Amino acid sequence: MKFSESWIREWVNPPIDHDQLIDQFTLAGLNVEESRKLNSNKFYGIVIAKIIECQVHPSLADTWIMTVNSGGGNIINIITNNMNYNKNTKVVVANIGAILPNGNIIKQINIQGRKSEGVLCTFSMLGLNYYTQKGIIELPIDAPIGCNFYDYLHFNDNIIDINITPNRGDCLSVIGLSREIAAINQCKLKKINIKSNVPNILDTIPIIIETPHDCPKFLGKVLKNIDITIPTPLKIQEKLIRCGIQPINIITDIANYVLLELGQPVRIFDYEKIDKNIIYVRFSKPGETLTLSENNINIKLFSKTLVISDVRKPLAIAGVITGNQSSVSCSTHNIFLKVAFFNPLTIINQYKLYNLYTSSVVRYEKGIDPDISELALNYATSLLIKYCHGKAGPTINIISHNHLPKIKIIKLHRSKLNMILGFYIPDQKIINILTNLGFQVETQGHNWIVSTPSWRFDINIEENVISEIIRIYGYNHIPKIPAKISLNQTVQCIPNQVISLSKSKTVLIARGYQEIITYSFVDPNIQKLLHPQCIPLTLMNPISTNMSVMRLSLWTGLIQTMLYNQNRQHKNIKLFESGICFIPKNSHSKQVSQQLRLSGIRSGLRHYEHWDIHTSLTDFYDIKGDVESILYLFNKKNQNNNIHFKSCTYPALHPGQSAEIYLNDIFLGYVGVIHPMIQYKLRIHSNVLVFELIWDSIVNIKSQKIIDISKFPKNYRDISLIIPTHISASSVIETCKKIGIINLTEVKLIDVYTGRNIPTNFKSLTIKLTLQSKTHTLKEQEIKEIIIICTTTLKKHFNAIFR
């Protein structure tokens, strides 16, 4: 929601500066994404004036002398060749001494014996090139004479952009944001001054609502003899531009103006294009189409699309977009104004169906205040009558009260409030906070009965009310109370799960990784590429379409973060994340199991570039080593805890460079290279490697205990053997470990060879045995016996040939 500070201060103007205003928004839970000064050109001495007299210059053809009143009794003559304006027209004048944006200073000049004591200003002269109107600036008749034009349009303004969360649709308007500031500063909001809209014509339109569940409230009004050619007042244009909306015409601009100020979408139809002058709110019929007004694309309507129609054709997709069959044109004189309340779920389904996310959808999907409809209709009517003249008919009001949102009544307990907050707020302070937020409060002993405002759909339970109280009271005002502890207090042990995860993070950080935190809501398209076999939990009301499902693994967030960095020329990436993943229990229900997982991702070079170090691209064995370094924390050698990897096929991973991870035959997760097809679709430019560990499976394994280091020397022996290529080196190592020889402390692979002198489909492995006793120095005979046991076992299991 982008808006100007000056517009907020028209509604509520507390004695705080800009920085304090930003802080108040932030502390109230409204995330300010950007705050900047209005990018306007500076000019000085430019004022509003009134033309008193126009006369032809006696000595020059096509030249006139304008006598204007520029305020303070200052009557001056200005010579101009532009004669498009009449007596009493309000204009913008640069007096003598005025400074224009280009640095020019206005001076008195003589033209054929007549003095010119200023200049009538155009938009381009003042650097306001975003206005398309040509000629001298003309202002409304109520513009104050002598007022500084820079101040009149509030050019000394700030633009604020706030990221509105899905639960705070009430803040998608100037009035909604002003309510927050008024509540924090205990100020009163201004009231909209609407002149009485007494009907002066009797024209109405019958409105038939066939689906009151989807549209429980519909208001309308007929306006006739509207002049659409009148330019939109500059103040309205400036407000729209500062909110990121380009002015179009007076009708559309006023509709957008009311939308931004009150948060209620207003639709305006050409009255003459409504067939038989009857409005229906119904579902679409087979074969119906709608031509969109923005790009003249003709779309076929899906069944069960809620439309606004006349007797013959659809006029609009309800709450989403209007068709050009009924849109206002330059020849329009009679219009029909419509405001409505639609069921948010209906609008969400419709915009997803047609992929049309309009400014109206933004409001309707989050829920608009059903009680503001009539105010918005009357406000739009009064503005149109004020600027476009014309006559208005009576309000047409169709309401199904049974289908409108109900006011929620919640009991707030003083005991629960104190328990959650941890400190005491006086009763009157609580009542004032809730009343200023629009709640109705009734005291009941030590408790309160609270009725929610019509615009707050997010307040459902007692905890919601408590969060509102502390939000406005101010988190920064929570008293600092020293913690009270007892020396006899029982120390609570930290769960092994937390300790082991913390240790594992330390290991990864030591290996050059950086920790990230991402949302549990992820992009469904990326997740489907990684896990096509699973159906994720879908959010009913997502923040956005690319955050609409719950994550099945941490890879989605890691890959998106990696892509973000890759697109900013960061090539060497090592990231990890821990968090909850939501795994469906079966494909037939929405039940999920929540699993704590630890995942990592890396790409780029194995080592940072250095003139003295030869480096290469990271590969499968690098990330496999990272996983092993974590699992070594749990590898208790004397209890036969064995880490091993099994080749596997997983949709997200390269079929030849992926493996399942096991510890003590317990499945822990996957490691490997992202599948080449996925890398291509996501435009990943280098090999990306990932791992994921199911932490809930790891924590049940006891961590390695500290043991005494033997003071006796180690002995090393190498065994070279030839085995078939399909036998993995890890199975050879595990077989040696499982023999159970006490003095065999370590077995590791040191060489793999294929080629000359090795039969086809065979390979040569060399493994190194580390032998050490805790009680004595091993004798050569003892060592030979261990070697014989190992070679005999390997020959028996794998039919190995020793070199």
Curated annotation (Swiss-Prot):
B5 domain: from which residue to which, for each copy?
405-480
Q: Which GO terms describe its cellular component?
A: phenylalanine-tRNA ligase complex
Q: Name one GO molecular function term.
A: tRNA binding
Q: What is its main location?
A: cytoplasm
Coiled-coil residue windows: none
Which Pfam family, just one, is annotated for this protein?
tRNA_synthFbeta
Instruction: Tell me the disulfide pairings in this chain.
Output: none
Needed co-factor(s): Mg(2+)
Q: Which GO terms describe its biological process?
A: phenylalanyl-tRNA aminoacylation
Q: Which CDD domains match?
A: PheRS_beta_core, tRNA_bind_bactPheRS
EC number(s) recorded for this UniProt protein: 6.1.1.20
Q: Which domain of life is it from?
A: Bacteria
Q: Where in the cell is it found?
A: Cytoplasm
Every copy of the tRNA-binding domain together lies at 40-150
Q: Which UniProt keywords apply?
A: Aminoacyl-tRNA synthetase, ATP-binding, Cytoplasm, Ligase, Magnesium, Metal-binding, Nucleotide-binding, Protein biosynthesis, RNA-binding, tRNA-binding
Q: Which reaction(s) are listed as its catalytic activity?
A: tRNA(Phe) + L-phenylalanine + ATP = L-phenylalanyl-tRNA(Phe) + AMP + diphosphate + H(+)
Instruction: State the InterPro entries in the record.
Output: aa-tRNA-synth_II/BPL/LPL (IPR045864), B3/B4_tRNA-bd (IPR005146), DNA-bd_dom_put_sf (IPR009061), Fdx_antiC-bd (IPR005121), Fdx_antiC-bd_sf (IPR036690), NA-bd_OB-fold (IPR012340), Phe-tRNA-ligase_IIc_bsu (IPR045060), Phe-tRNA-ligase_IIc_bsu_bact (IPR004532)
Per the entry, the cofactor note is:
Binds 2 magnesium ions per tetramer.
Q: Which family does it belong to?
A: Belongs to the phenylalanyl-tRNA synthetase beta subunit family. Type 1 subfamily.
Q: How does it assemble?
A: Tetramer of two alpha and two beta subunits.
Official protein name in the record = Phenylalanine--tRNA ligase beta subunit
